[in-house]
Amino acid sequence: MSGRWHSYSSYLKSTYGKPVYRIGLDGGFSCPNRDKDGRGGCAFCDGTGSVAQYQRSSESGFFRDSSYTDEVANSLLPRAQSLSAQADRAEAFLRRRYKAELFSVYFQAFTNTYAPVEELERLYRAALEAVPGAVELIISTRPDTLGDDVLALLSSLRTEERAVWVELGLQSSNDETLRRIGRGHSAACWEDAVRRAKEAGLKVSSHVILGLPGEGREDYVRTALFVDKAGVDGIKIHNLHIPGGSRLAEEYREGVLTAPGMERELEDTELVLRHLSPGIVIQRLLADTPFHRLMAPRDFPDKFIFLTRLEERMTAYGTRQGDLL
């Protein structure tokens, strides 16, 4: 661990000998929380999903249906071809901007295991063929869409040269919070998914959000300890972002919800880091929402300033990841 926390960049350099850059792909998946039952998705989601910067010109461009109909089956070929085009565009961008040499394939937008396993296999393999030599395959998904057949498929895609990661959204270990934000699963469901993924030989990371409605520092500590006990390999810690089209935006407009500013976020992030084992890779410390979609916080400083301030704060106080365990 270099610095005050086990950064993702240091993990990648120590594992692969040089920086690794993610190629974020949109496979045209949907989400069980946005399907025909009318739940409308998680309270913090505006319906556009998480799309990489270099793919954002085509946000929400896919037909998103979870049922395996002839229409979906027939769409697999153009979807696979789209993945190849996305990968080419992303790789060109990353090579030009960062002189990148090593890459991860990252299925990023929406719920990337929410489809029949035969559909998943075709799309995953198409993406890996589009990025030969990728050192990681990363699948972002929900714990309630991770069946044993999907885990077996993901395990089969591992090689000596390529790790397979599953990113499982948790957000909070408090079931009442999960109900309030409409996650549609429990903390126990997430815990079971982590256990089964680890048994399948996969690497697991999780997402948590600081600043959710009704939560405070005791909740953040409980969530950190819950994630730590589950044995995850990595974590993404997000500050609360309120997109304009989300249900949280309504609460914000009504004045019943605020988005934490930088000083509070610095304190809360430090507290969470101190309750995570030093071996857990810190893959992210801030959310990343396009500014034109963001209602709040609008005046939060950029990522570099935040990370610099966090490093300075933890150095000044002599704190580091895992020192309160």
Where are these regions (language model features)?
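Conserved SAM/AdoMet-binding glycine-rich loop
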Residues: 95-185, 192, 199
